[in-house]
Amino acid sequence: MRTEMTPLVLSYQEADDILEHLVDNFFNEVPSDDDLYVPSLYELYDLDVESAGEDNNEQAVNEFFPESLILAASEGLFLPEPPVLSPVCEPIGGECMPQLHPEDMDLLCYEMGFPCSDSEDEQDENGMAHVSASAAAAAADREREEFQLDHPELPGHNCKSCEHHRNSTGNTDLMCSLCYLRAYNMFIYSPVSDNEPEPNSTLDGDERPSPPKLGSAVPEGVIKPVPQRVTGRRRCAVESILDLIQEEEREQTVPVDLSVKRPRCN
């Protein structure tokens, strides 16, 4: 069964009495302006926290910031639940923050590394480097002595390099690079000639100074340019009408009728 709700109608006097009752019983302790005062930074600068006398609020402040909260902040730990601020307050969620204790940690590295470099170690390193360089030089000299490049008179015959490549590939017509260049005249080997003098850049092929010197006399064989006067007048294609008549008379015997227009040639 559904019951309809009727609105409550109060008179002005009844509403005033209810509001006065609420103010007298619930809002009678209104904090003053002095209770809401926040000290400034300049007032906190000279605050003496190391007072000689006993502080009545010392225990309350220590309970407000427990040591576990300070350690958690310094270690960067995330606290999902708010800590217990005072013995009166109960933890929210039914879980308490674990008690943290300071602990000394050893952050030294005890891994064995290379020994410190002293005079004896430097001498040993220098000796090993000298021995390695001597062995490499001896191996290079031995390879240079064992390898002899043949230079036969006829390229490709009685050449050890050619025989090596032929035996390794099975191609009897194969030649080494030096014999190939000599056989097909890719390069011409000749004794080193004397240094040739550098050409004189101030003379041309005819032993004349380059560039030529300017003078008043004109050299022989030079074509002089003919000056032409430039005008804006149009030139006629023919000198007179008789030139056109003479050209057409060569192709036809009938005189040209100049009173009519000439037909276009397709």
UniProtKB/Swiss-Prot annotation:
Its main location: host cell. A motif (PXLXP motif, interaction with host ZMYND11) lies at residues 98-102. A motif (LXCXE motif, interaction with host RB1 and TMEM173/STING) lies at residues 107-111. It is found in: Host nucleus. A zinc finger (unnamed) spans 159-179. Keywords: Activator, Early protein, G1/S host cell cycle checkpoint dysregulation by virus, Host nucleus, Host-virus interaction, Inhibition of host innate immune response by virus, Inhibition of host interferon signaling pathway by virus, Inhibition of host NF-kappa-B by virus, Inhibition of host STAT1 by virus, Interferon antiviral system evasion, Metal-binding, Modulation of host cell cycle by virus, Modulation of host E3 ubiquitin ligases by virus, Modulation of host ubiquitin pathway by virus, Oncogene, Transcription, Transcription regulation, Viral immunoevasion, Zinc, Zinc-finger. Disulfide bonds: none annotated. GO terms for molecular function: molecular sequestering activity; zinc ion binding. One of its GO terms (cellular component) is host cell nucleus. A motif (Nuclear localization signal) lies at residues 261-265. GO terms for biological process: regulation of DNA-templated transcription; symbiont-mediated perturbation of host cell cycle G1/S transition checkpoint; symbiont-mediated perturbation of host ubiquitin-like protein modification; symbiont-mediated suppression of host innate immune response; symbiont-mediated suppression of host JAK-STAT cascade via inhibition of STAT1 activity; symbiont-mediated suppression of host NF-kappaB cascade; symbiont-mediated suppression of host type I interferon-mediated signaling pathway. Signal peptide: none annotated. Residues 39-47 are annotated as: Interaction with RB1 in competition with E2F1. Residues 195-226 are annotated as: Disordered. A motif (PXDLS motif, CTBP-binding) lies at residues 255-259. Residues 75-145 are annotated as: Interaction with UBE2I. Plays a role in viral genome replication by driving entry of quiescent cells into the cell cycle. Stimulation of progression from G1 to S phase allows the virus to efficiently use the cellular DNA replicating machinery to achieve viral genome replication. E1A protein has both transforming and trans-activating activities. Induces the disassembly of the E2F1 transcription factor from RB1 by direct competition for the same binding site on RB1, with subsequent transcriptional activation of E2F1-regulated S-phase genes and of the E2 region of the adenoviral genome. Belongs to the adenoviridae E1A protein family. Interacts with host UBE2I; this interaction interferes with polySUMOylation. Interacts with host RB1; this interaction induces the aberrant dissociation of RB1-E2F1 complex thereby disrupting the activity of RB1 and activating E2F1-regulated genes. Interacts with host ATF7; the interaction enhances ATF7-mediated viral transactivation activity which requires the zinc binding domains of both proteins. This is Early E1A protein. It comes from Human adenovirus A serotype 12. The lineage of its organism: Viruses, Varidnaviria, Bamfordvirae, Preplasmiviricota, Tectiliviricetes.
